């Protein structure tokens, strides 16, 4: 169907699992499971609902007549009532007790929470796999020296693996926030039109204990520890904000990673995966653009901005509820999850297939290391050669200025080390100088830090989630 808009989050970016979570089938069958849980619980607490009625409801959880539902919604202009009528049409015996005492938000809001939990679990699975891939990458390259950058200007060397631990640490923070939200998510429960439980109190002839028990039973049947203690007709929309805040955090981390990869690609120190028939540019046939990292940045920007929808919606609710949240939430919440799913799939694909070019890293180090090594040279020549610290400092300054001019004005290579080696004031041999400028001597505790981080921070997480490891990371385009 090419004469209508289709969402690229589904056609290009998000995986099948996340698309299923936010599919009509999953949404409306969850509505029906909630209706079954309500009827079962009401029967258990003494309302006149028969086993035959319950069996009829259970038998028709997934066979949803969408055409019939669309016709009913066109008539009644109310999606929940349309599906009440649709469910009732295939469960005629149970129709009289369907949705008994409930309001629309009983199925709507509770389903939103259930789907968000399912979606967070899928995001967690992807996130753990990305962390594992980063850990493998960091371990593999923990001792590979590379130039570090501050302000994107050359700084003291680090290692490729140590840099990867920075990316992984951001994701561990995101995982911690995700786990917190999963642990604290609760259902709306069944509190009626304004959150007072009045309709259920009437059903149970004023028995407050039965109203409380009803909600507990429903929560247990739906796999939740409980409901939010108080609510209006809806659960607080701050819940949506807090959940989307987790996704925004993941997007921030992924965007930072993608920016680093794009810059490293420009430096020719890494290449992201590139298919045999892939085209980088329609005009420049030689190009290998970091398009997957660019796509991560693009989708991340969307998720970060989407958080504002949840913030504004939460702030704009009136009293016990208003409907100005509805249309926005139908779009903003699923799309945040679909986009984040796409982001993490791309992240996993890139880091698993990332090619590192040590010779290019060494080349860039060689260009800058002479300047970075001057302090070590100065100290060695004072301590081991008996040199005058001030005289040596002035000699280094003069040679550094001259070498810098040669590089910047003449486009030449950095010959600072050759100048120092040729200057008798230093008295250095080639072997001595080579040892003083060994890149590994300038990476500090990078290897130790990487090993410690992987052992103490990453390994416990991967051990906890062993069953989640092994996700595929196929990219559609």
Language-model region placement:
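Active-site-adjacent "gating/activation" loops or surface patches in catalytic cores
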Residues: 208-233
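Active/binding-pocket-proximal capping segment
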Residues: 271, 394-402
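Short, well-ordered beta-strand elements within core beta-sheets of diverse protein domains
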Residues: 162, 241-249, 376-385
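Long, amphipathic alpha-helical stalk/connector segments used for oligomerization, subunit docking
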Residues: 302-387, 395
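A conserved active-site cap/scaffold subdomain adjacent to cofactor or substrate pockets
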Residues: 234-269, 278-339
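A helix-coil-helix interface module used to build multimeric assemblies
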Residues: 1-198, 206-217, 280-281, 291-295, ...
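Glycine-rich cofactor-pocket loops
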Residues: 139-161, 271-287, 320-327, 352-372
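Amphipathic alpha-helices that form helix-helix packing interfaces
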Residues: 38-41, 123, 127-130, 134-137, ...
């Amino acid at each position: 169907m090419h004469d209508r808009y289709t969402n690229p989050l589904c056609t290009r970016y998000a995986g099948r699992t996340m698309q299923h979570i936010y599919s009509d089938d999953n949404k409306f069958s969850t509505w029906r499971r909630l209706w079954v849980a309500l009827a079962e619980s009401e029967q258990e607490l003494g309302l006149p609902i028969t086993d035959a009625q319950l069996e009829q409801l259970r038998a028709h959880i997934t066979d949803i007549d969408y055409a019939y539902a669309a016709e009913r919604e066109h008539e009644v202009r109310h999606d929940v009532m349309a599906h009440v009528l649709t469910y009732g049409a295939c469960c005629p015996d149970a129709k009289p007790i369907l949705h008994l005492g409930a309001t629309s938000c009983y199925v709507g809001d509770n389903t939103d929470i259930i789907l968000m939990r399912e979606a967070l679990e899928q995001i967690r699975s992807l996130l753990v796999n990305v962390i594992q891939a980063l850990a493998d990458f960091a371990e593999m390259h923990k001792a590979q020296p590379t130039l570090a950058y501050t302000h994107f200007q050359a700084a003291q060397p680090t290692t490729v693996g140590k840099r990867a631990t920075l990316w992984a640490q951001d994701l561990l923070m995101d995982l911690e926030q995700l786990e917190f939200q999963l642990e604290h998510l609760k259902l709306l429960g069944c509190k009626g039109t304004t959150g007072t439980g009045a309709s259920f109190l009437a059903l149970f002839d004023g028995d407050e204990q039965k109203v409380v028990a009803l909600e507990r039973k429903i929560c247990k049947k739906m796999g939740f520890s409980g409901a939010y203690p108080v609510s209006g007709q809806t659960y607080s929309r701050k819940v949506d904000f807090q959940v989307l805040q987790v996704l925004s955090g993941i997007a921030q981390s992924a965007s930072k990673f993608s920016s680093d990869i794009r810059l490293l690609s420009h430096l020719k120190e890494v290449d992201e995966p590139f298919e045999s028939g892939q085209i980088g540019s329609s005009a420049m046939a030689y190009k290998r653009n970091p398009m997957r990292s660019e796509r991560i940045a693009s989708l991340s920007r969307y998720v970060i901005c989407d958080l504002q929808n949840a913030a504004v919606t939460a702030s704009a609710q009136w009293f016990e509820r208003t409907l100005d949240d509805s249309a926005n939430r139908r779009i903003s919440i699923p799309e945040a999850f679909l986009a984040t799913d796409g982001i993490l799939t791309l992240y996993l694909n890139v880091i698993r297939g990332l090619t590192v070019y040590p010779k290019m890293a060494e080349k860039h180090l060689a260009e800058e290391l002479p300047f970075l090594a001057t302090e070590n040279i100065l100290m060695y020549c004072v301590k081991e050669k008996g040199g005058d610290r001030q005289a040596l400092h002035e000699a280094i300054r003069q040679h550094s200025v001259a070498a810098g001019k040669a590089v910047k004005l003449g486009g030449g290579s950095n010959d600072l080390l050759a100048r120092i080696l040729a200057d008798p004031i230093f008295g250095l041999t080639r072997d001595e100088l080579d040892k003083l400028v060994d890149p590994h001597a300038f990476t500090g505790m990078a290897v130790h830090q990487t090993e410690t981080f992987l052992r103490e921070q990453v390994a416990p997480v991967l051990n906890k989630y062993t069953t989640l490891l092994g996700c595929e990371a196929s990219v559609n385009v």
